[in-house]
Amino acid sequence: MIKSALLVLEDGTQFHGRAIGATGSAVGEVVFNTSMTGYQEILTDPSYSRQIVTLTYPHIGNVGTNDADEESSQVHAQGLVIRDLPLIASNFRNTEDLSSYLKRHNIVAIADIDTRKLTRLLREKGAQNGCIIAGDNPDAALALEKARAFPGLNGMDLAKEVTTAEAYSWTQGSWTLTGGLPEAKKEDELPFHVVAYDFGAKRNILRMLVDRGCRLTIVPAQTSAEDVLKMNPDGIFLSNGPGDPAPCDYAITAIQKFLETDIPVFGICLGHQLLALASGAKTVKMKFGHHGGNHPVKDVEKNVVMITAQNHGFAVDEATLPANLRVTHKSLFDGTLQGIHRTDKPAFSFQGHPEASPGPHDAAPLFDHFIELIEQYRKTAK
């Protein structure tokens, strides 16, 4: 039985469609993502916590879903908005169609709306708070009330909400289409011990570090610097994550203590912003953020262009960079800062997602640079 669904934005704009997920309501910041596929990775990316994701590609759900494509243990997106859900999910890896997957994870979703109109609105007015109501006779007035009651992501610390409850080890590398998920690697195959802060870490980041010889200890977002230093790490990784970086004072304090040592530090996405804040820079909320797998970024030091995956609604304000931070990468879409490197410490970060999943791997060599810094540190400090 087809059920109705309604999306209402805080400005009062209404989109009527049909429900393809759970019955109920979802409230969050409405953003758009331009990736053509990879919807399951997007839904399970913790960076989308408290956000309703609009996918601009018209056909979503063609290849179904499977366990291997999940970037975390649950769906973190607050809701999903698409143009069209195909009648058939066809792929040799498919184990469950998208609609069933959404219902099983209790995710409210709407289809059959004009996503081009919605995307234009978000580009012109900026990301807006919104509410999806799915079920019989959805109440537009109630949806508007809920959308306007949502406080927004400014000032919202979500890293401590999505982080792991306890520390754990990770030694699994990348999987292949033919071989599936690999067995965990043995410790003697992983010469580098890296402590990774989980601010909302994606699994493919962890896999790419393991591929390069890292034995990972994943720690909760609020783990103190003292506890991490007792683990005697060869490197410290700062993961991606949702929300506003500025309220994460616990992480900023820890990073500042790491920067008093010579241990290499590598940050991605939220981790990039936290490294900048710990170094004295400031961050700002973007109009509608960067969300997609086709964003051109210039490596200003090598004078080359990379096509990258992006997912962030905050950015580091380049005008506030202290003297000990140099710019390494910039967005060719809007000129915003994409990468920094400390001039006095082996610490650097990237705003985009070099692990992709979904997206291109042009920025993957950033992981190799982290390993180079670790090898130099081990030679001089140990």
From Swiss-Prot:
Residues 193-380 form the Glutamine amidotransferase type-1 domain. L-glutamine binds at S47, G241, G243, L270, Q273, N311, G313, F314. Composed of two chains; the small (or glutamine) chain promotes the hydrolysis of glutamine to ammonia, which is used by the large (or ammonia) chain to synthesize carbamoyl phosphate. Tetramer of heterodimers (alpha,beta)4. Residues 1-189 are annotated as: CPSase. Its EC number is 6.3.5.5. It is an enzyme of class 6 (ligase). This is Carbamoyl phosphate synthase small chain. InterPro entries: Anth_synth/Amidotransfase (IPR050472), CarbamoylP_synth_ssu (IPR006274), CarbamoylP_synth_ssu_N (IPR002474), CarbP_synth_ssu_N_sf (IPR036480), Class_I_gatase-like (IPR029062), CPSase_GATase1 (IPR035686), GATASE (IPR017926). Belongs to the CarA family. Signal peptide: none annotated. The lineage of its organism: Bacteria, Pseudomonadati, Pseudomonadota, Gammaproteobacteria, Enterobacterales. The keyword Cytoplasm does not apply.
